[in-house]
Amino acid sequence: MRVKKRNVRGNAKNFITRSQAVRKLQISLADFRRLCIFKGIYPREPKNKKKANKGSTAPTTFYYAKDIQYLMHEPVLAKFREHKTFARKLTRALGRGEVSSAKKLEENRSTYKLDHIIKERYPSFPDAVRDIDDALNMLFLFANLPATNQISSRVIRDAQVICNQWLAYVAKERLIRKVFVSIKGIYYQANVKGEEVRWVIPFKFPENIPSDIDFRIMMTFLEFYSTLLHFVLFKLYTDSGLVYPPKIDVEQDKILSGINAYILESQEETSVLNAEVPSDAPDKEAQSIDTKTLAQAMKADSKDKDDNSNDEAPENVEDVELDEFEDHNKNKGDILAQPSKFSSPTATLFEDFVFYVGREVPIEAIEFLILSCGGKVISEAAMDQIEGNTEFDLSKVTHQIVDRPVLKHKVAGRTYIQPQWVFDCINKGELLSANLYLPGVSLPPHLSPWGDALGYDPTKEVESEDESSDSSEESDSEIENEEEDTKPAAITNEDDDEDVEELAAQKELELEASGIAYSKAKDEGLHDDVASKKKRKVTDEDEEEKKLKMIMMSNKQRKLYKKMKYSNQQKEDKIEELKKKKKQLAKKEKTLKKVEKK
């Protein structure tokens, strides 16, 4: 009999511990973490940890052995090893006091790029767009952090540039769909190339950075995400015919830095401008033109001049307008109406409006949303920094956004609103009444456009007292009928027919006693009773089927099913409680209105 070797198959072969992986790759633990983040490799959980760890029960981190084998052929791994030798040589040179050799080493240090990793992980562009949610969240987080010993100002500045380029593109293409102001920040959702992208921008408050955060891991993620976003933005800008990276208006950036400072130019305009600008240094190919070719070009130029002189000789010739003929036989039904550039209703929501934003309103969020919906913005904070205010025409202002309770002076012809009006209009996809958002008025609740975790919809209207009483009576009658009906769930067709006949006879007697013709009310009352009877039968059959399925479940599945039922019941109870509170509030409001009328 052949002896079976232990720990050579199954979990022991498929999984490898982290310490074994580090020894196999011959790099430090920090470099191993960076490499795993770049390549998208994360720890795995084997079914049997004891077998995977070759009999040991010590807590360890496992990876797939094939993933580690895949990392061994990574070009970035060689760059990490080169950097390790560079650091060793640099410390040796500095220790000896050889400053010149240290400078040479610093100038010739090896660098790596993540371009090939981006192409490997995201073979198609929709895959990259689908995965930029986390990238945007990380970059907007770093863009709002202060510079510290662990985070350099260059990193924060680069993150701010990428974030502003993203916002400028979304505003230019009018891709915003939903927005929600929460405690954490402002959530945005945009439709980019058919993919829903959602990200959060934190509020610009002074941040207290905790001391227990590992910024090395976060900086590694930031490095990868910034490279990914550069790829995505380049593709988005070029597909839209825009120049990437966009130019920055220095004067506008000094006044009020934001997406208004970015100039989005089309590639056609820049190509025309480059063609018009004469080149100072002629090309080498242009210098080596043959004399024969030059003579042919001079002859062609002379011919063109003669033709132009002949064409320009008759000066007083009247312009003759040619008749235009229409083809009436052409089938106009074949011509399809082309859709507009902005198909979403939110894209043209504020197209005819000019907003004057007060200095107390956060300009970054409001400006981005208004520009994304086609509106124009005039900021009071920007006007304060410009002397003379000659660039702004305030006569075209239609709406003024105010976030203060009382206004001393009001301009006729303007609609005064609070900032929440902009958010709610975008979520609804239509212009809401401005009377609900006047300055100093208590605002309606700002609800999440993505719904509640419980599934409760507070926008639904409260049922009236008559409807609620009718529904309660119906439920009571159903409960009574269920209590009376003590028959088992498996009812035969013969029993159903007998029950229907008994119901019909009883209904006929009741109608004769009340003086109503049975033939008139037969189709109304009898069918309702039969339908309710059949409905109860279906519910009983469903309950019986659920019981049979639970019997066939394993103990683990049964426990999981009970937990799910318990959590769902808790959600339903919470929803019912909220509905009751809403009904009570509606009743109080009605009574108060009645008292005020009296």
From Swiss-Prot:
Region of interest (Disordered), ranges: 296-317, 452-501, 515-544, 564-598
PROSITE patterns: BRCT
Domain BRCT: 345-439
Tree of life domain: Eukaryota
Subcellular location: Nucleus, Nucleolus; Nucleus, Nucleoplasm
Compositionally biased spans, kind Acidic residues: 463-485
Purpose of the protein: Component of the NOP7 complex, which is required for maturation of the 25S and 5.8S ribosomal RNAs and formation of the 60S ribosome.
Name this polypeptide is given: Pescadillo homolog
Gene this chain is encoded by: NOP7
